[in-house]
From Swiss-Prot:
Family: Belongs to the aspartate/ornithine carbamoyltransferase superfamily. ATCase family.
Origin species: Legionella pneumophila (strain Corby)
Annotated positions binding carbamoyl phosphate: 49-50, 99, 129, 132, 256-257
Designated name of the protein: Aspartate carbamoyltransferase catalytic subunit
Keyword Transferase: yes
GO molecular function term, any single one: aspartate carbamoyltransferase activity
Recorded name of the encoding gene: pyrB
InterPro entries attached to this UniProt entry: Asp/Orn_carbamoyltranf_P-bd (IPR006132), Asp/Orn_carbamoylTrfase (IPR006130), Asp/Orn_carbamoylTrfase_sf (IPR036901), Asp_carbamoyltransf (IPR002082), Asp_carbamoyltransf_Asp/Orn-bd (IPR006131)
GO CC terms: cytosol
Domain of life per record: Bacteria
Length: 297
């Protein structure tokens, strides 16, 4: 692969290869060395999990790592991001992990600069978060092998979620049996890539093998959508009661950060069915697999 931009651009075989390579790294702890490769992390949005996970993945692969401090960079003087990348590429940096609030920015950069650099999308606006989809699927297949037999439910603000967009795509590519998108009507997407939409929490969770909770974006609640937290919690939170509609061994997942007591109760987030910390662990190995697939291409 030249770039890693969105799941829809990958074949099912490429995705399967990334999943298996991530699990190989996790179980063997045998990491190749790519010490001649230099990578820069450019995060124009706040991040804990994704940023640190990518950096750990890079260091496990013995890459030389540059973390750009946007507060002290020429970006504060108005430098365009493409000029920043051209400048860093002239210094010998080949790989760029980028998170940005603008939908499609990484694709545009790849179109303009793709002959000389490799672009990795660490999240663009509400559009895509492909590495999250890979790590989520690594977490699922580690426990539940037959994807075509699974019912997976995504719960929350589907409309504004890059996580939900990328996960729909990966479920379609890998032939997941059933995907249900559970959301209040005001947060339901105008376009569904894969699966079906419902505003009935209990029906959506009925018999689910995997439940993925999405963060309630409080800033959108207050400014745009006029949906109050009490309504959401009473009708869409993942509690012990609502979890009981799923299968007894259902996996509970969340991309983080969590709003405990809003979209998910602590008893569920910390309970025996929770795989949230496994997602965090697997994120490092998934991103190692992604980076390795770009090196030498």
């Amino acid at each position: 692969m030249k770039h890693f931009l969105e799941i829809s651009q990958l074949s099912s075989e490429q995705i399967e290869s990334l999943l298996q390579r991530a699990l190989y790294f996790k179980h063997t702890k045998q990491y190749p060395s790519y010490s001649q490769s230099i990578i820069a992390n450019l995060f124009y949005e706040n991040s804990t999990r994704t940023r640190i996970s990518f950096e750990l993945a890079e260091r496990h692969l013995s890459m030389s790592v540059v973390n750009l401090d946007l507060q002290t960079s020429s970006e504060t003087k108005g430098e365009a991001i493409e000029d920043t990348i051209r400048t860093l590429a002239a210094m010998g940096i080949q790989y760029f992990v980028i998170r940005h609030k603008q939908d499609g920015l990484q694709q545009n950069l790849a179109n303009k600069l793709g002959d000389t650099v490799h672009i990795i999308n660490a999240g663009d606006g509400t559009h895509a978060h492909p590495s999250q989809a890979i790590l989520d699927m690594v977490t699922i297949v580690e426990q539940k092998k037959q994807l075509d037999k699974l019912k997976i439910a995504i719960l929350g603000n589907i409309k504004h979620s890059r996580v939900a967009n990328s996960f729909q795509c990966i479920c379609s590519k890998l032939g997941v049996g059933e995907l249900v998108l559970i959301s209040p009507e005001i947060w339901q997407p105008s376009q569904v890539h894969f699966g079906r939409v419902t505003d009935n929490l209990n029906e959506g969770l009925e018999g689910a093998d995997v439940i993925i909770c999405l963060r309630v974006q409080r800033e959108r609640l207050l400014q745009d959508d006029h949906l109050d937290l009490d309504f959401y919690r009473n009708n869409f939170a993942l509690t012990q009661k609502s979890l009981s509609y799923a299968k007894p061994d259902a996996m509970v997942m969340h991309p983080g950060p969590m709003n405990r007591g809003v979209e998910i109760d602590s008893e569920v987030a910390d309970g025996k069915q929770s795989c949230i910390l496994q997602q965090v662990t697997n994120g490092v190995y998934a991103r190692m697999a992604i980076l390795e697939s770009l090196i030498g291409s």
